[in-house]
Every structure is written in C-alpha cells, then in structure tokens.
Amino acid sequence: MKKLTEFLSLKKKSISIQVGIAISFTVVALFAMGAFGITMYHLFTNRMEAMMSENAVQLLDQTATNLESYLKNMRRISDTMYYSVIKDKDLASEDMVQEMNLLYDANKENLVSIACYTSNGNLVEAVPVAGEKEDVDVTEQEWFREAVGKMENFHFSTPHVQNLFDDANYRYHWVISLSRAVELTKSGDSELGVLLVDMNYSSIEQLLEKANTGINEEYVYLMDGDGEIIYHPKQKLIYAGLYEENNEEIAAWDDGSHKEDFWSENRLVTVKTVSYTGWKIVSVIWVCMRQGCFS
C-alpha cells in the first residue's frame, strides 16, 4: 500500500512537471507568435508607407514637371514681350499694340491679358481690353509692389479676380499674375515700368486636377512659399470652413516625405518645391488600417 502511494505521488509530480513544461512551451510559442506578428505588421506597414511615399514622389515629380513647363512658357511670353517689343520701342513716338496682340493671340488659351505700366501706375498699353476700370490704383496691388520692390525677379501672385479692365460680357476672370520690372524708353530716356502677364487660373487648375485620382484618402494641392493655397481639390470646403488643411505648417517643411498626426489620424505628406516660384506641390495620403481607409 505504501509503495502504491509513493508511485502515485511520483506519477503526480511527473504529470505536474509535464504540464508545467507544456504551459511554458505554450507561453513561449504564443510570445514568439505575437512577436512575429508584430514584426510582420511593422514590416507590412513600413513597406506600405514606403510604396505610398515612392508613388507620391513620382506623382509630384511628374506634376511639377508639367507645372514648371507651363510656367516656363509664361516666363517666355514675358521675356518675348520685354526683349523683343518693349526694348525696341520709344514710347514717345511708337506703340506696342500690334506686337502685343500677336503675342496674346498665339497664347490666348492660357492668358487673360498682357499689360504694361509706368512706375507711377499709368497704363502704357494692354491687350485685349475694352477699357481700364476707373478708380483702380495698380501701385497698391501686390503684383505691382513686388515687381518694383524686387526688380531683378519674376513674381507670381496667388489666384485672384482680375479687377483692372472692363469686360464686355461682364465676366470675372480668376488669374495668377506674373509681373516684373522693365525699362521703358521715352524720347530716348529710360524709366522704370512694370510688365504684367495675367495667366488664366483654370490652366493651372486643370494641371492639378489631373494629379488627383478622386480617391478621398489621397489628394494633391498647390500652395505658395508662405502656405497660401493656390489650388486644392477641397478648396470650396476650406473657404466655407468645412475642411481644414495644415498648409501653413507644411510650408516650412523640406522637400520629401513626412509623417504627421492631423485630426488624430496619421498622414503621409510629401512636399515638392516648384522651380523659380517657391511654390510647393503637396501630396497627402491618410494612413490608417481601419476599414474604409484602403479599398
């Protein structure tokens, strides 16, 4: 009887050891599986973010190339007007209307008007216009002040409604102004002037619309170097106060991809600076794993 009791006791201890070993192995296995799962999750998310970042960079590079090509053409129009027309004219005895009309007609799909002013804001010539609006002081407008204040540079404004000239059809034109200081000649004497090329905003809008796929979680927008929005697919909602963008902070960021927490959600933000303008094209991708973020 004593031997049976000892045998049962030893067997019980053996079973307890086996159970302990099994539990230990189970815990270790679960821990290893958990660690493996976490590692794979991070690898997956990192890879996913790397792919999104790479795609965003490629999209912005292409968009920037298209935009820079368009803006380069606008600068070429300004250069042609200045070096081939203005510099060849003595305004005391000659006008520039014919040459300005030819230049406008060749580029009218992208232009609203071309105008030249003296340093005190008097209109020298403009095409194609029905007449100058009354009580408009161009010397108070930003594009004019920028051109006079920094004479060596081109200056691109943000979008605005042109208020310089009357329109026979009473239309309002949204434009982006390209201005520069020029040298005018009158009776052989040189004086400062300002050349203004008003670009049709819709041309730039169409370029940016092509970069937006229609997916709510991904979009591309354009702002100037100070963070003022030039184009945004949700622009109307922003103006109505129904949508917010982190554009003022992002304006200070370097080119490349950045992670940010916005509206308590993670976003992948990629920035690309447009040559000659200081403008920034921004790609925004909402990064989350909850249902509805990716389809």
Model regions and ranges:
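Extreme N-terminal signal-anchor transmembrane helix of membrane signaling/transducer proteins, especially
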Residues: M1-N46, A50
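Juxtamembrane membrane-water interface segments immediately C-terminal to a transmembrane helix
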Residues: H42-R75, E94
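Extracellular/periplasmic ligand-binding regions of membrane signal-transduction receptors
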Residues: N66-Q98, I114-G131
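Solvent-exposed, extracytoplasmic
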Residues: V97-D105, A130, V194-L237
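Extracytoplasmic/periplasmic ligand-binding sensor regions of membrane-associated signaling proteins
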Residues: D105, N110, L123-M199
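Amphipathic coiled-coil signal-relay and dimerization helices
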Residues: T118-V129, G227-P233, T270-K272
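Helix-start (N-cap) segments at beta->loop->alpha junctions
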Residues: V161-L164, A181-K186, V197-L208, K236-L237, ...
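Extracellular/periplasmic juxtamembrane segments that couple receptor/chemosensory ectodomains to their
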Residues: D226, K234-S295
